[in-house]
């Protein structure tokens, strides 16, 4: 899953695109490198990012989705939003196929009803707190168990509402310390009990560059290591900034598994 941020302030500068020419160039690059789906986001979730009104988020998404339809109409497209009205617009008007909700329905209580009505796949992500508060003092007794239970409860609720095409995302970096992130990664296999596909988003995040020292721009090597570990531990989808490196990691893991 290649990341397309139609924002001016996402945490990794290399993923920011605002103008149609930039969006088109980014999409062509990801498609050529082997992206199998595109995730379009118009609201930066990094702590301290400027708030964006629903109207502005929709305007950005309309612009981005229009270019996606032009460049790669054959690829599935997810829309990265926690707002139900934005999700509805993106699917019904913009042609998005999947809703990717970083808040797991917690920041807009209409989200579950909306995706059930849209009958589209839904990416359910765990986050403790909100983007503004999530890194102030995250606390868990057992992060792997608590994240698994949290996801399981919401998957059950979604099933009861008629939403059955669900992908689970443990939410690396969202309301978790460095130690929490690596404990969660170490126990990633625990999420197999959810019996849904697993998405992992660790690309160029602080769990890479804070551990190694450096910045998001210097975090590709560490990201590739985490992608490899995630695939070996059962991840089905990688949400990535650097498609070529992720595709190569996937090919190597698949070759190892084929010959094991």
For each predicted feature, which ranges?
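Short polar catalytic/cofactor-binding loops
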Residues: 5-9
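Active-site-adjacent loop and "lid" segments of alpha/beta metabolic enzymes
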Residues: 11-29, 45-63, 67-70, 76-78, ...
